[in-house]
Amino acid sequence: GRTLISISWSLQRARYGEHPFWMACVLAAMLGQIGLPGGGIGFGYGAIGNIGKTAKRMQGPLFEQGTNPISDFIPVSRIADMLLNPGGSYNFNGEKRVYPDIKLVYWCGGNPFHHHQDLNRLNKAWQYPETIIVHEPWWTATAKRADIVFPATTQFERSDIGWAKGDPYIFYMPQMISPVGLAKNDYDIFSELSGKLNCKEKFTHNQSSDEWIKNIYDKFYKQSKDQGIMVLNFETLKEKNFERMSIDLNEEDYVPFKDFRKDPLAHPLGTPSGKIEIYSEKIANFNYPEIPGHPTYNKPFLDKNFPLRLLSPQPHDKLHSQLQAAVEDTNDYAVLMMNPKDANARGISRGDLIKIWNSRGSCLATLELKETILPGVVSMATGAWFSPDEDG
C-alpha cells in the first residue's frame, strides 16, 4: 500500500517549528515512497483549493516590477528587533547580520499589527522611527499609529484584473463606486509622490492606472495568441467581466519528485547535496545549540504559573483580520474556546467576559465551552484587532 504523510502548515508556527516538518520528510524518506503516485509527503492539504491538484500553473497578466536595488533584508518576524536595536547584530541561517538604522517606515498593503507575534513589543518599537507612513482604507491599529495616513481605495473603488495560477478564469474587476472621501488608488498616491520627487514620468510612463491595466492585458493577449491560447481582447473582457480561457491546466500524471526518484543525478533537489537531507552539514555548521544538523525534539517552554496552552487557529468568520467590523456587530470581543472541566475549575460559564493573560500581555474574550477542546488547552482564533488600554 501507499502512504502519504500530510502535514498542516500550522506546525511551523511555534518555537522550533522547523523540526516537525523536517522529521516528517525524514519519515517519508524512510518509507521510501517519495516520487510515487499517492505516496511521499504533502503540506497544507485542504488549506486552499490548489494544494495537491495535479495541474500546471497559468501565467496571467503581470506588471513588470524590475529589480529591487536594495539587496539587504531582515526576517519579517524581526521587525520589532530591528527597530529596537539599530546597528545591533543577529544570527540568520549561519550568518552574522546587522540591523539597519531605520528612520522612516512606509507600509502599503499589509497590517503588521495583525501578523506580528508580540504586539505589545511591536507597539513599543513603533515609537522609534522618525516617520511612519501608511496606506489604508480602514482605521486599523497600524493606521492609528502612523504619522501620515494616505486613505487608499478598496477593490470596489478602482478597476483591476484578477486571476490565479491554478485557475483557468480571468476577471475584469470594474470600479463599482467613486472613491470615498479623499481616498485614492495606491498607484495615484505614488504618482503624486513621484511628482514631488521630480521623477513622475519615470514612474508613470505618462499612463494612468486604467491605461496600465489595458497595456498589461494587451501584452498578455499577444503572448497568449503567440502560444496558441485564445483569450478575449480587452474590450470584450470588460463587457463580459470574466472568461474561462481555452487552456487545459490538468496534468493527470503529475507526481511530486517523480523525476528525482527516476534519476536523482539528472534531477537533483535544491539542497546542497541535491538529495533529501536527513542530516544537513550546512545547518550543523551554523553551530546553533538547539538546531543541530538533524531534526530533534526540543522541550516546550512551560510555566507553572500559566497552566493552559493556547492555540490560535484561523477564524471561520474573518479572513485573517479582515471583516472584523462585521464581527463586532454581534460580539465586541474575541471568543475563547475552553473545556467545561477547566471552566468549572475556575468558576466561569459560557458567555462570561474573561481576562486572559501571561507574562507577555493580556486581552479580554467571551467564553465558549466545547467538549472537543482538550482539558488544559484553550483556543482563540487569530484576527482580533489590537486595541490596548492604558495598561496594555
Residue spans of the language-model regions?
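A generic secondary-structure signal for well-formed alpha-helical elements
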Residues: 31-38, 146, 153, 197-201
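Alpha-amylase-like alpha-glycosidases and glucanotransferases acting on alpha-linked glucans and related
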Residues: 176-191
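A glycine-rich, hydrophobic/aromatic-adjacent loop/helix-cap motif
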Residues: 1-93, 259, 267, 277
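A glycine-rich phosphate-binding loop feature that marks nucleotide/adenosyl-phosphate handling sites
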Residues: 40-51, 206-221, 238, 360
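A cross-kingdom feature strongest in bacterial/archaeal respiratory oxidoreductases
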Residues: 64-180, 215-392
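Non-catalytic, well-ordered alpha-helical segments in soluble enzyme domains
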Residues: 187-204
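Short coil/turn segments at secondary-structure boundaries
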Residues: 4-10, 37-44, 204-208, 232-237, ...
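Short, solvent-exposed helix-loop connector elements
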Residues: 6-15, 174-180, 202
